């Protein structure tokens, strides 16, 4: 598989004819241009494929890849090339992105930053321009979502370039158990996710030691952490065969873990993420050298998190005003922490739930609908 070609090459020769003042203004304009270009780069993301209508994604290979791949919002040049080559993969890239976004929102549902999406191709807004631990989690869980979706699509025969898993038989599998079936092709899912997701970072060129180069290294590390988490959590699944459920024979195969398990593991990594900085050789190193170096499965970040308590257009924080909170909780979902000490308002709402359920022979459950008035609390 060919590597995407880098597209950013900001080498510019400056003439001297205009004098010192002209050169000064030219340099200022150039700096402004690249600052704007960086914002544009960060503002567009392949994550937007997870926000599209599924019909639009499936049309990529029905109508023909050439025009649609160029029109898909958020793809870098390298990712567009991969779209042209692997038309049938794009629907599952979108499914993987959607899986990652949903898992992010589940894991952070009780946090001040709750992985909210915005209505543009950045998906998460300006907050992703900050190299925070929240950004680290988002990159990791999105990359993990792509591995998950691609591996499953291979197993289900949806892709022309892969099929069932060819993973080697585990050494600890009992000798009388058969290794076969059609397992999730995690090897292929991992490789393609790496090629596609990392393409944007690898084609960006920035000066060694710059903030932008540190962000690239951070993003690549967290992408890999997400992929590795899916890979390492995959396990052997087995099915019994035999007369009357005797299980005299077992067939086993490699199977993806439930994605909630992946999200839980990455959330733990988020809580213990390592603060990093660039050293003189242009490598990421820990800010606190007394701690163990992060592994390939750990998350890393280079910026402190912004204040998520109040709305801030420059950082992308939406604030917590209007968020529901739990009056009795002392955790992050509690009104004291969620509302950042601003207090909360109380209102009553009507909830309808299934109740008084009974099992009827044979074979259904019949329930009544019960309504109750409950108190809810929202941050001021």
Swiss-Prot record:
Gene Ontology BP annotations: anterior/posterior axis specification, embryo; anterior/posterior pattern specification; atrial septum development; axis elongation; axon extension involved in axon guidance; axon guidance; axonogenesis; BMP signaling pathway
Pfam families linked to this entry: wnt (PF00110)
Lipidation positions, renumbered (O-palmitoleoyl serine): 244
Keyword Transferase: no
Modification comment: Glycosylation is necessary for secretion but not for activity. Palmitoleoylation is required for efficient binding to frizzled receptors. Depalmitoleoylation leads to Wnt signaling pathway inhibition.
Keywords, alphabetical: Chondrogenesis, Developmental protein, Differentiation, Disulfide bond, Extracellular matrix, Glycoprotein, Lipoprotein, Secreted, Signal, Wnt signaling pathway
Disulfide bridge partners, by residue number: 104-115, 154-162, 164-182, 238-252, 240-247, 309-340, 325-335, 339-379, 355-370, 357-367, 362-363
PROSITE patterns in the record: WNT1
Residue stretch(es) of the prosequence: 38-61
Presence of keyword Transcription: no
Signal peptide stretch: 1-37
Listed GO MF terms: chemoattractant activity involved in axon guidance; cytokine activity; frizzled binding; protein domain specific binding; receptor tyrosine kinase-like orphan receptor binding; signaling receptor binding
GO cellular component: cell surface; extracellular matrix; extracellular space; glutamatergic synapse; postsynapse; Schaffer collateral - CA1 synapse
Annotated glycan sites: 114, 120, 312, 326
Subcellular location: Secreted, Extracellular space, Extracellular matrix; Secreted
Principal location class: secreted
Subunit structure: Forms a soluble 1:1 complex with AFM; this prevents oligomerization and is required for prolonged biological activity. The complex with AFM may represent the physiological form in body fluids. Homooligomer; disulfide-linked, leading to inactivation (in vitro). Interacts with PORCN. Interacts with WLS. Interacts with glypican GCP3. Interacts with PKD1 (via extracellular domain). Interacts with TMEM67.
Function, in words: Ligand for members of the frizzled family of seven transmembrane receptors. Can activate or inhibit canonical Wnt signaling, depending on receptor context. In the presence of FZD4, activates beta-catenin signaling. In the presence of ROR2, inhibits the canonical Wnt pathway by promoting beta-catenin degradation through a GSK3-independent pathway which involves down-regulation of beta-catenin-induced reporter gene expression. Suppression of the canonical pathway allows chondrogenesis to occur and inhibits tumor formation. Stimulates cell migration.
Record-stated family: Belongs to the Wnt family.
Protein name in the entry: Protein Wnt-5a
Organism: Rattus norvegicus (Rat)
Name of the coding gene: Wnt5a
